[in-house]
A protein has these predicted regions:
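Intrinsically disordered, low-complexity regulatory segments
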Residues: 1-157
Length: 157
């Protein structure tokens, strides 16, 4: 199955209607060889200093600068986000391909890439570049989904 991940439920419904994924499931739509799921804004954030080292919980000049070897991300602590992320992670683990249908631009790209990283995505990812989705008719669609490497520059914020 091909998994489409949208940035919001309304876009998922619009895309689902276009590609024939109209059967409602818990946290996603299904049909015609596709799963269409969604986030709702930011699901992930950068880790806090204490997430790296417990001694960084309290700010002290002794520990400055606080520079981890590698910056990490974590899922936001929210029951709804955790539940929907569980759906996404399960679908990612079963998908043969993922299509990033996040909002156009750097922020939309970052939201989707962090979710895919947290979900440990190991299948090919493509990017569907949408400027707007309206009334089950995709507007501003620039062709077929493209390999993700064509949009690599967007991840450099």
């Amino acid at each position: 199955m091909i998994l489409c991940i949208c940035e919001k439920p309304s876009v998922a419904r619009d895309i689902g209607a276009v590609i024939g994924a109209t059967t409602q499931r818990q946290g996603y739509l299904e049909g015609n060889g596709y799963w269409v799921t969604w986030t709702y804004g930011h699901f992930c954030t950068l880790k806090e200093p204490a997430d790296y080292y417990p001694q960084w919980q309290q700010w002290s000049l002794v520990y400055l600068p606080m520079m981890p070897e590698r910056f990490g991300i974590k899922l936001l602590s929210d029951r709804g986000i955790e539940q929907q992320f569980g759906v996404i992670k399960s679908l990612v683990s079963q998908a043969t391909e993922v299509i990033n249908c996040g909002d156009a631009g750097q922020e939309g790209e970052l939201i989707q890439r962090w979710v895919l990283q947290m979900a440990e995505c190991r299948v090919p990812v493509k990017r569907l570049w949408l400027l707007e989705s309206l009334n089950n008719r995709l507007v501003g669609h620039r062709g077929e989904p493209q390999p993700l490497h064509r949009h690599t520059a967007l991840r450099h914020l």
